């Protein structure tokens, strides 16, 4: 299993009238792989998974995998708040030849820690693919405790967690006791370097859409022992770390992609596009980092 350290949580391109833009998805996927992404996560939070149909997700998994082939890992976002539905989608994704699955903590129904364990255990038993768990309590309404993550890490095909809790202590607690081959990815671009400093593996990134090569340079500097160089790149990227999250993700990154002439299109309701003030801040951050 070689996913790489920078996985981009890819946006889902739409046409001006809100239809799925598969040609745009293929072109964007190829661009991202050519510009610093080791792999792509498809139909996750940044991919607007709540407003994608089952059929659209399947089409995205198929076409993105075709577009990048063996050049990069394609991780399918198949987690939902229904265990049965997640199993069905995961099996279909596996049949399409994706390289792994990302499973979000079930949202809205607020399961207990035991419920979370049983949910992920059941999905893992239904697939042979390696799995990334995805903990994002700000969106799901339920934090997956470190103890639960550690229980799940003992399951042979659960290989990683995307920790988007923003809690470095929680990530550290996982890293202290997890199996040696269990990977902890940051779910927050701005915490990539701090998390790697305590043993994290990499980032499932939004910012890599527009600054993948700079993100890659930061990670490579750190892993080569050039901590000062990595820190300098972190500071250089800081305006983007903030500007691309000034309103609900993926609204800002889609605006940034459009400014750079890359496939993105609008967001789907109930999300709405950035305000004029937000667009100005996004453009300013792109200019400050030499991208626009």
Curated annotation (Swiss-Prot):
Taken from the UniProt record, the cysteine pairs bridged by disulfide bonds within this chain are none
Where mainly located? cytoplasm
Q: What pathway does this protein act in? A: Amino-acid biosynthesis; L-lysine biosynthesis via DAP pathway; (S)-tetrahydrodipicolinate from L-aspartate: step 3/4
- Localization, UniProt: Cytoplasm
Catalytic activity, as annotated: L-aspartate 4-semialdehyde + pyruvate = (2S,4S)-4-hydroxy-2,3,4,5-tetrahydrodipicolinate + H2O + H(+)
* UniProt-listed Enzyme Commission number(s): 4.3.3.7
Matching entries from PROSITE patterns are given as: DHDPS_1 (PS00665), DHDPS_2 (PS00666)
Positions contributing to pyruvate binding: 46, 204
State the GO CC annotations. Answer: cytosol
GO molecular function terms attached to this record: 4-hydroxy-tetrahydrodipicolinate synthase activity
Locate the active site.
134, 162
BP GO terms, sorted: diaminopimelate biosynthetic process; lysine biosynthetic process via diaminopimelate
Keywords (alphabetical) are: Amino-acid biosynthesis, Cytoplasm, Diaminopimelate biosynthesis, Lyase, Lysine biosynthesis, Schiff base
EC primary class: lyase
List site positions: Part of a proton relay during catalysis: 45, 108
Q: Which NCBIfam families match?
A: dapA
Q: Tell me the subunit arrangement.
A: Homotetramer; dimer of dimers.
Family to which this protein belongs: Belongs to the DapA family.
Function as written in the Swiss-Prot or TrEMBL entry: Catalyzes the condensation of (S)-aspartate-beta-semialdehyde [(S)-ASA] and pyruvate to 4-hydroxy-tetrahydrodipicolinate (HTPA).
This protein's name: 4-hydroxy-tetrahydrodipicolinate synthase
Source organism per entry reads: Moorella thermoacetica (strain ATCC 39073 / JCM 9320)
Instruction: Tell me the lineage of the source organism.
Output: Bacteria, Bacillati, Bacillota, Clostridia, Moorellales
């Amino acid at each position: 299993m070689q996913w790489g350290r920078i996985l981009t949580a890819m946006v889902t391109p739409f046409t001006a009238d809100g239809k799925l833009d598969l040609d745009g998805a293929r072109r964007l996927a190829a661009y991202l792989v050519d510009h610093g992404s080791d792999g792509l996560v498809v139909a996750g939070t940044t991919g607007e998974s709540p407003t994608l149909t089952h059929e659209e997700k399947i089409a995205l998994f198929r076409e993105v995998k075709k577009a990048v082939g063996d050049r990069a890992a394609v991780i399918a976002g198949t987690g939902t708040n229904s265990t049965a539905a997640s199993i069905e989608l995961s099996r279909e994704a596996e049949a399409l030849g994706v390289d792994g699955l990302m499973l979000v903590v079930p949202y809205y129904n607020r399961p207990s820690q035991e419920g979370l364990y049983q949910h992920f255990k059941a999905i893992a038993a239904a697939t042979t693919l390696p799995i990334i768990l995805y903990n994002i309590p700000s969106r799901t309404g339920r934090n997956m405790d470190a103890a639960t993550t550690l229980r799940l890490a003992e399951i042979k095909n659960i290989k990683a967690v995307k920790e988007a809790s923003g809690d470095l202590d929680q990530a550290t607690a996982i890293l202290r006791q997890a199996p040696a081959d269990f990977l902890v990815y940051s779910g927050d671009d701005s915490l990539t370097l701090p998390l790697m400093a305590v043993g994290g593996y990499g980032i499932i990134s939004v910012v890599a859409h527009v600054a993948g090569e700079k993100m890659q340079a930061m990670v490579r500097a750190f892993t080569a022992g050039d901590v000062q160089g990595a820190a300098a790149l972190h500071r250089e990227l800081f305006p983007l770390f903030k500007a691309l999250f000034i309103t609900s993700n993926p609204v800002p990154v889609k605006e940034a992609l459009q400014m750079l002439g890359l496939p993105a299109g609008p967001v789907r309701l109930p999300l709405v596009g950035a305000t004029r003030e937000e667009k100005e801040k996004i453009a300013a951050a792109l200019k400050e980092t030499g991208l626009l």
